[in-house]
């Protein structure tokens, strides 16, 4: 009986030992990263500005009406001079008259628009998007009356023709570029007009309309009238 006492005591000590605490596992919450959203261009307003005017620009065979310096480039409007009253190259019977030229710092022509034909006025006006530094150029056209303007996009040293804004305010004292508002979004470039009434196809059909949110929209492919 005495031999059982030490054995019982050892057994008691064995069970009285503190049980090791099990590590508590905290459930890990899986966090799914959100897919990066595409950058959305908020409506950016193009504001008119006046670039540096260049005097005495010499372009062989070209009669310069207006010339400007922008970001190291020259932008000039005018027309190639006829020889003895005849159309000569680079003009052709289908491509002559007032046009826009882009020249690099070596005075080389890197872009020329298609000739618009005859006009007393073909004057560039400049509008800049401060978000991306793109520039819209609208060449105001006129005979004895104003008759719209051609729109171009100047982006990173490249020129692109957008289309013809065949519209004017219904007031012969002011012109297209006096009422023009330009805005850009991810959907394209919108041209609107600060005038109660407008004339479509001025100089030809002269169709007078109310300005019920009339606009031209360039949708990255073509320039279209919405009315």
Residue ranges and their predicted role:
Residues 131-134, 138-175:
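Short helix-loop boundary/capping segments
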Residues 17-66, 154-164, 171-227:
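Acidic, small-residue rich beta-repeat scaffolds with periodic aromatic anchors
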Residues 22-120:
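Terminal domain-start segments
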Residues 71-77, 129-140, 186-193:
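Acidic/hydrophobic-patterned starts of short beta strands in beta-sheet-rich repeat architectures
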Residues 83, 141-145, 197-201:
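Short glycine/acidic-enriched loop and turn motifs that connect beta-strands
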Residues 1-4, 18:
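Positively charged n-region of N-terminal signal peptides that target proteins for export
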Residues 4-13:
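Sec-dependent N-terminal signal peptides
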Residues 89-97, 143-147, 206-211:
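Short, solvent-exposed loop/turn segments at conserved positions within beta-propeller repeat blades
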